[in-house]
C-alpha cells in the first residue's frame, strides 16, 4: 500500500520489472503508475482507495492524477 493526498491506497495487483533506475524508492517513474523500488520497478495493475471499490489502473488514473516524479510513501 501507499499514501497519496492523505488517503491510503492498497495495491491489489502488480508486476515486478527487473529494470535499472536511478530514482529514490517510491518515485513514480511513468504516467502509467510504475514505481521505482529497491532493485527494479513495480508496475501497478489494480488498486483500491480507502472506502472505494477496486479499480484497474486505467480506471484509477482517469479520476486520480499522480504525476511522474511524485514520491509515494
Curated annotation (Swiss-Prot):
Gene3D superfamilies: Formyl transferase, C-terminal domain (3.10.25.10). Its EC number is 2.1.2.9. InterPro entries: Formyl_trans_C, Formyl_trans_C_sf, Formyl_transferase-like_C_sf, Met-tRNA-FMT_C. Keywords: Protein biosynthesis, Transferase. Attaches a formyl group to the free amino group of methionyl-tRNA(fMet). The formyl group appears to play a dual role in the initiator identity of N-formylmethionyl-tRNA by promoting its recognition by IF2 and preventing the misappropriation of this tRNA by the elongation apparatus. It catalyses: L-methionyl-tRNA(fMet) + (6R)-10-formyltetrahydrofolate = N-formyl-L-methionyl-tRNA(fMet) + (6S)-5,6,7,8-tetrahydrofolate + H(+). Belongs to the Fmt family. It comes from the Bacteria. This is Methionyl-tRNA formyltransferase. GO terms for molecular function: methionyl-tRNA formyltransferase activity. Pfam families: Formyl_trans_C.
Amino acid at each position: 500500500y501507499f499514501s497519496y493526498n492523505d488517503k491510503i491506497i492498497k495495491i491489489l495487483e502488480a508486476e515486478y520489472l527487473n529494470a535499472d533506475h536511478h530514482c529514490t524508492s517510491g518515485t513514480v517513474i511513468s504516467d502509467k503508475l510504475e514505481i521505482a523500488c529497491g532493485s527494479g520497478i513495480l508496475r501497478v495493475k489494480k488498486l483500491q482507495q480507502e472506502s472505494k471499490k477496486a479499480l484497474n489502473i486505467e480506471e484509477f488514473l482517469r479520476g486520480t492524477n499522480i504525476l511522474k516524479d511524485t514520491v509515494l510513501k
